[in-house]
Amino acid sequence: MMNRVILFIMDSVGIGALPDAEQFGDLGANTLGNIALQENGIDLPNLQKLGLGNIDGIVGIEPVESPLGAFGKSLEVSNGKDTTTGHWEIAGIHLKEPFKTFPNGFPEDVINEIERKIGRKTLGNKAASGTVILDELGEEHMRTGSPIIYTSADSVLQIAAHEEVISLDELYKICGIAREIMMGDNAVARIIARPFIGSVGNFSRTPNRRDFSLDPSGDTVLDIAKREGFDVIAVGKIEDIFNGRGITEAVHTVDNMDGINKTIEYIEKQNKGIIFTNLVDFDSMYGHRRDPKGYKRALEDLDKRIPEILESMRDDDIIIFTADHGNDPTYKGSDHTREYIPLVIYGKKVKANTNIGIRKSFADIAATISDILEIPSTNKGESFKNSIIK
């Protein structure tokens, strides 16, 4: 009996603009394809062997004659291209309305309330790149002790503070207060703690980021699996994205390699259910920073670890490699891109060389996991279990 699914989110590894990408300002975006074009190819032999290059319409990765796994790609139904929207849809939620964004900064009354409740003035209150705003306001923050508030094209309120000026505990408390305030009409998908270290002109963000999300708007496959007595293990920022809902055990990570190490540790344990891992570096370190060289290197570093991941699996495990949105590092701006996500599925019980085509929703992943674990579904998406299992 199959009783465990390992789900790897390669954060932002999109594989081509969705049909509605123009509405999101993302015509021509192709995270994987454009990195390959700009950087003279990407060497991903292990993902290639599993079927990555055999996905319909993929650019930059050559197909192999007999891929070992099943493969396909998926459209996004929900109205958005952010982390929360993507992960929630993967887990079985369709969002008709996009989360609210604040491209011109947050309302004055909101900022005033945050300042009153945290007992500090704040800096910033505008849309900005996280690294640029540290260069601009980091020195003033060091001098005044005022946290830096900023946003992006996503539905986020981000709060940056130097770890020697505002302790991590206090920064997390400040973010918790902001989360309570940013509800109702002003609800953003996430409040993000952005701690940093260093000196003026040489600031750098630390891995101690923490996200404070909204509760999912309905039951996810995680909630259902937990209720049915399965383990739901969250590696990386998964716990934050779901606000802890439907999770039985969670561990945070410092980078992709740490995420892979911790996932392998969990695979080798006697658990059953879902191991749900987010590898965030592709997005946070290279996508937003428009660094195709770094992105390529990070993809190749993951690929080198694939044999080790697969060797740790049990005979009845199913592993799915996918993404949550795009973030084309060759594209204009510094924000996510509305793209297809890849689906590469492997296991001893998975039929080799199986093309599952273009899926109509990321929620097909949730439906398939429900089917594999034989638990009730979220009633979103269509299972591809019968297409892939021997």
UniProtKB/Swiss-Prot annotation:
The UniProt entry, under Pfam families, shows: Metalloenzyme
Tell me one GO molecular function of this protein: magnesium ion binding
Q: In which pathway does it act?
A: Carbohydrate degradation; 2-deoxy-D-ribose 1-phosphate degradation; D-glyceraldehyde 3-phosphate and acetaldehyde from 2-deoxy-alpha-D-ribose 1-phosphate: step 1/2
Q: Name one GO cellular component term.
A: cytosol
Binding, Mn(2+) 1: 11, 324-325
Single GO BP term: metabolic compound salvage
Q: What is its main location?
A: cytoplasm
Q: What class of enzyme is it?
A: isomerase
Localization terms from the record: Cytoplasm
Annotated Mn(2+) 2 binding lies at: 283, 288, 336
Record's keyword annotation contains Manganese: yes
Cofactor dependence is on: Mn(2+)
Ordered alphabetically, the record's keywords are: Cytoplasm, Isomerase, Manganese, Metal-binding
Catalyzed chemical reaction(s):
2-deoxy-alpha-D-ribose 1-phosphate = 2-deoxy-D-ribose 5-phosphate; alpha-D-ribose 1-phosphate = D-ribose 5-phosphate
EC number of the protein: 5.4.2.7
Q: Does the keyword Nucleus apply?
A: no
Q: Cofactor note, please?
A: Binds 2 manganese ions.
Family from the record: Belongs to the phosphopentomutase family.
**PANTHER family, from UniProt?**
PHOSPHOPENTOMUTASE (PTHR21110:SF0)
The record's function comment reads:
Isomerase that catalyzes the conversion of deoxy-ribose 1-phosphate (dRib-1-P) and ribose 1-phosphate (Rib-1-P) to deoxy-ribose 5-phosphate (dRib-5-P) and ribose 5-phosphate (Rib-5-P), respectively.
Q: What is this protein called?
A: Phosphopentomutase
